[in-house]
C-alpha cells in the first residue's frame, strides 16, 4: 500500500481546521485523520456529489440527521425499509438534489435494494466508510458488519476514514493509498493512569471526594455500571447510554434513566457510556467534562480499552474538549504475551491443521467417518476465521488485534508501552490504589464451578489478609460482603481461627463442634452439650448403636463431664435427648445388617 502524508496546521486564530478546508477525500484511499473531530463526515455530507456514508452505529445517524436537517441527509436504521429509501430517492431526483444517505453496515442491503427499485445505480455515488477500524474491532460479534465489502470494492469512488484506522490484511486494499494526517502542533492529551485491584472501590473512593463538573464514564459492561451506581447511591444523579438490549436489561432491574441515543438534555452529573458511544458520536457540551475510562479484565474482557483506538476515540467524542482524563485499570497476568510474528505463525499452523482435516474429509467415503471429520472441522480454531469457505481477513485481523490488546493488559509496563506507542498522550502514572480485597478475589468467590471447600479456603485467605488492615468502615464493608457469600466460615474464622478450620478440612461438623467447645471454654452456659448433640445427630438420619455409643462417649469427654449419678454411657443414653426408633442398617463392608436408631425428633 502506498503512503501519502498530509500536514495539518492550525488556523491563524489558533483553531484546528475542518478537513474539508485543507483536503478533499480521494478514491481508493484509507484516510488516517489522526485527530477525532476533523469533520470528515460533515465534509462529505456537504460535498457537491451524491454520497453514501457507512457508519458503525445508529446513534451517529441520529445525531447527524438532527444536525443536518437542511442538507437532505437520510438516515437508514432498523425501522427504515427499502421502500422508504426508494421514496427518498424519487423525491431527491425530482428536486435535483444530491443523494445523501447514511447507513449502518447491517442496513446497507436496504440501500442497494432501493436503488434497484428506482432503476438507478448506487455505484454512481461516492462511498465513504467512516470509522473503518470497527470492521476489524467488531466483526467477532457483528458478522454482518463486513457484508457490504464486496459492494464497496465495486464503487469507482470510495474511501475508508478513521482517526484510528487499522491496517487491513485483505489483499483487495493493496492498490489503495494510505493517507496519513500529521498535525504540525502538539495534539497530545494529558491522561492519568490509575492502577487498582478493586475497580468499584477505587471509583467509589475517587468519586466520594466530590464532583463539581459533569463526569463521563466509558465502561463497556452494564452490570458493572449498575453495581457502581448502586454502590455510590447515585441513582438519581446518573444516566446510562447504551444499546437497546442493555436499556431493557437496566430498566428491568429498576434503573430508568437509560437511553439508546445521545441527548444532552438527558445527561446528568454522572454519565455512563458503553462501546456504542466510543466512536463517531458528537457530544457537544457547554462546559468541559471530566472523563473516566474503566477497565476490569477479571470481570469482563469487554471492558478492555485499546489505547490505539478505543481510548483515542472515546476522548474525541467531546467536540469542545475535556477537563481531567483518567483511566482506572486492573491488569491480568493470566493474559498471554503474544507478538504479531507469533500470531502469524499461529495462523499458519491453524490453517495447516484445517486443510489436513478438510482433505481427509474430502477423501473419505464412509458416512460415519465424514460426520466425525466434519465435527472435527467445526471445532478447529481456523474454522472461526472462514466465511463462505474462504479465509476471512477481517476475522483474522480481529483475532490478531484482540490478542495484542490483551497482551497490553498483561501488566502495567506493557500497558504504558502501548500508550506511549500511540504518540497521542502525555502520561501521568498515579500511585496505585490497591486493596486487601480485590476484583480477582471477588471473581474467584463468584465462580460457580468452584466447590464449597475451595470457596471457603479462598475466604479464609482473604480474612487472613484483612487481619493486617486497620478497622475501618471499608473493612466492615468487605466483611459484610464475605458474610453474604458464606456467613458460617466468616464467623468460624473469628471464633476458632484459621488453623482449626484447616485441621477440620473446611467441613461443617468438626468446625461447628470446635466453635461450641470454644464457647464452653470461654462462657459455659449449660447448653453446649445440646449444641454438640444436635451437631452430631440429625432428625431423620439412621445411626448404628456402636456409632451412637462411641459418639456420646466422645462428646461427654470433650466437655469433661459425665451423665448424672455417673450413669454408664450406652447407646440407650441417646433416649435422654432424642425420640428414636429401632431400625436395621446395612453394613456395606460385611453385607450384613447392624442394629441402630433412627432419630425421630429432639426432646431437648
Regions found by a protein language model. Give the residues of each.
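Conserved strand-helix element at the start of the C-terminal RecA-like helicase core
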Residues: 50-64, 102-105, 203-233
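Inter-Walker segment of RecA-like/P-loop motor cores
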Residues: 70-113, 253-262
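SF2 helicase motor core recognition
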Residues: 36-46, 60-62, 107-121, 162, ...
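The feature captures the C-terminal accessory region of ATP-dependent helicases
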Residues: 44-47, 346-604
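Conserved SF2 helicase motif VI
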Residues: 298-325
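Conserved Walker A/P-loop ATP-binding site and its immediately adjacent core
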Residues: 36, 40-80, 106, 167-169, ...
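SF2 helicase catalytic motif II
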Residues: 105-108, 116-153, 157
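Interdomain hinge/linker at the junction between the two RecA-like core domains of SF2 helicases
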Residues: 163-208
Amino acid at each position: 500500500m502506498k503512503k501519502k502524508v498530509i500536514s495539518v496546521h492550525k488556523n491563524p486564530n489558533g483553531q484546528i481546521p475542518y478537513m474539508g478546508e485543507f483536503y478533499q477525500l480521494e478514491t481508493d484511499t484509507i484516510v488516517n485523520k489522526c485527530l477525532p473531530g476533523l469533520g470528515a463526515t460533515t465534509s462529505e455530507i456537504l460535498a457537491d456529489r451524491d454520497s453514501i456514508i457507512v457508519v458503525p452505529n445508529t446513534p451517529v445517524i441520529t445525531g447527524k440527521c438532527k444536525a443536518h436537517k437542511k442538507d437532505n441527509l437520510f438516515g437508514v436504521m432498523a425501522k427504515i425499509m427499502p421502500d422508504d429509501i426508494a421514496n427518498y430517492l424519487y423525491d431527491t431526483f425530482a428536486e435535483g438534489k444530491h443523494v445523501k444517505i447514511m447507513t449502518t453496515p447491517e442496513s446497507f442491503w436496504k440501500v442497494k435494494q432501493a436503488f434497484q427499485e428506482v432503476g438507478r445505480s448506487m455505484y454512481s455515488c461516492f462511498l465513504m466508510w467512516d470509522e473503518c477500524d470497527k470492521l476489524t474491532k467488531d466483526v467477532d460479534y457483528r458478522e454482518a458488519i463486513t457484508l457490504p465489502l464486496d459492494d464497496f470494492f465495486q464503487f469507482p469512488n470510495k474511501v475508508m476514514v478513521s482517526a484510528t484506522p487499522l491496517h487491513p490484511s485483505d489483499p483487495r486494499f493493496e492498490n489503495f493509498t494510505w493517507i496519513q494526517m500529521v498535525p504540525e502542533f502538539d495534539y497530545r492529551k494529558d491522561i492519568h493512569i490509575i492502577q487498582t485491584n478493586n475497580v468499584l472501590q477505587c471509583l467509589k473512593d475517587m468519586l466520594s471526594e466530590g464532583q463539581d463538573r459533569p463526569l463521563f464514564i466509558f465502561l463497556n459492561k452494564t452490570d458493572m455500571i449498575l453495581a457502581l451506581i448502586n454502590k455510590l447511591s447515585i441513582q438519581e444523579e446518573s444516566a446510562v447510554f447504551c444499546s437497546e438490549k442493555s436499556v431493557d436489561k437496566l430498566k428491568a432491574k429498576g434503573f430508568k434513566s437509560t437511553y439508546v441515543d445521545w441527548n444532552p438534555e438527558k445527561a446528568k452529573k454522572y454519565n455512563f457510556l458503553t462501546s456504542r458511544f466510543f466512536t463517531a458520536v458528537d457530544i457537544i457540551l457547554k462546559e468541559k467534562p471530566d472523563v473516566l475510562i474503566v477497565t476490569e479484565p477479571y470481570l469482563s474482557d469487554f471492558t478492555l480499552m485499546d489505547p490505539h483506538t478505543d481510548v483515542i476515540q472515546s476522548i474525541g467524542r467531546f467536540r469542545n474538549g475535556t477537563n481531567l482524563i483518567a483511566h482506572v485499570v486492573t491488569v491480568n497476568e493470566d493474559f498471554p504475551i503474544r507478538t504479531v510474528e507469533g500470531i502469524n505463525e499461529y495462523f499458519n499452523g491453524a490453517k495447516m491443521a484445517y486443510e489436513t482435516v478438510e482433505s481427509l474429509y474430502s477423501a473419505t467415503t464412509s458416512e460415519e467417518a465424514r460426520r466425525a471429520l466434519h465435527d472435527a472441522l467445526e471445532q478447529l480454531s481456523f474454522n472461526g476465521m472462514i466465511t463462505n469457505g474462504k479465509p476471512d481477513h477481517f476475522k483474522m485481523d480481529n483475532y490478531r488485534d484482540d490478542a495484542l490488546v490483551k497482551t497490553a493488559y498483561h501488566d502495567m509496563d506493557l500497558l504504558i508501552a502501548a500508550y506511549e506507542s500511540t504518540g497521542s498522550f502525555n502520561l501521568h502514572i498515579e500511585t496505585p490504589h490497591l486493596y486487601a480485597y480485590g476484583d480477582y478475589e471477588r471473581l474467584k468467590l463468584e465462580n460457580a464451578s468452584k466447590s464449597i471447600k475451595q470457596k471457603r479456603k479462598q475466604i479464609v485467605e482473604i480474612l487472613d489478609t484483612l487481619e493486617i488492615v486497620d478497622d475501618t468502615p471499608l473493612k466492615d464493608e468487605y466483611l459484610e460482603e464475605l458474610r453474604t457469600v458464606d456467613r458460617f466460615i466468616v464467623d468460624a474464622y473469628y471464633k476458632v481461627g484459621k488453623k482449626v478450620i484447616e485441621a477440620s478440612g473446611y467441613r461443617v461438623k468438626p468446625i461447628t463442634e470446635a466453635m461450641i467447645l470454644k464457647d464452653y471454654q470461654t462462657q459455659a452456659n449449660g447448653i453446649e452439650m445440646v449444641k454438640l448433640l444436635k451437631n452430631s445427630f440429625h432428625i431423620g438420619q439412621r445411626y448404628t448403636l456402636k456409632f451412637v455409643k462411641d459418639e456420646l462417649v466422645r462428646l461427654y469427654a470433650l466437655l469433661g463431664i459425665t451423665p448424672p449419678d455417673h450413669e454408664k454411657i450406652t447407646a440407650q443414653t441417646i433416649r435422654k435427648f432424642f425420640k428414636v426408633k429401632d431400625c436395621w442398617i446395612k453394613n456395606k463392608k460385611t453385607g450384613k445388617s447392624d442394629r441402630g436408631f433412627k432419630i425421630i425428633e429432639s426432646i431437648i
